[in-house]
């Protein structure tokens, strides 16, 4: 669990607590970590599905950022902390272009057919055309941790001080902004924004999800995915995690120390909600919603009613990524760079594939039967489920 503290209105991250799985950070004289919630050992199993490596490349280390690939058409866009940004062929991994932004990056990538956007150090928004040429840059109010959302001719970012700003994708002109009070403590995660034809769905600290009108940024509705509760600021963290998922006529979201659920995308009316806690986002298909809770359990719920379909507890405390459906499986990465493939039907482990030994970060993306993901050490891998 990573937590950022904010002071006044500048939104500067003062501290990142990365020791949720050990007690070493509480004892500076300890010679080695003392496990508090040790990660589950990888069980031996007989693979029931073939997974092949389609391609791998290295973009560069992520550092503390949670970069994730962005798919658009037949291309995948990736970025690294040192400023590297690349466009790859999604089928082969061949490099179409690679540039360096010239500044450290903190968030990315957001992309559509004509626009590529990242967040840079100091709260700078950098936007490029699909051929890698810089189009414009703009200054946000504070650090950007989540990939910019790019769609409908807009680039929308949320900064750590809880300010949401929409820029014109072509000119960089500011179209609108909305700011909400920022709590004193928030997850240092990669907060996401999803966009449809009418609205931007924004996950907020404090457990709120807001639908903003694309025309002017006005709130169309607001719902509580989590409710801050407890005696301490740490106990009261209830942030929406990851990118809200658009699934049919619903939009679904999950919160840390909160709930998982789906609401009507047009009205915000709750379809269903369950107690849940997650630091990462969700995956969805035409039947189910998939989520990995903070203890490493992978859960499937029916999309229409939230009925529990299955639960896999075999990956407990392995710091999982958001699970995503691919082929007949649900793919979920872990802190050692493994990608696990679970059955969509019952959650049984079907296959496992190793990468570079570092954590799978961000949210994997899927094209056809191939899942593409990025690790903290910089590997971008494409695995095909057969």
Regions found by a protein language model. Give the residues of each.
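WD40 beta-propeller blade core
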Residues: 86, 126, 165, 210, ...
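Conserved beta-propeller blade signature
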Residues: 75-78, 116-118, 155-157, 200-201, ...
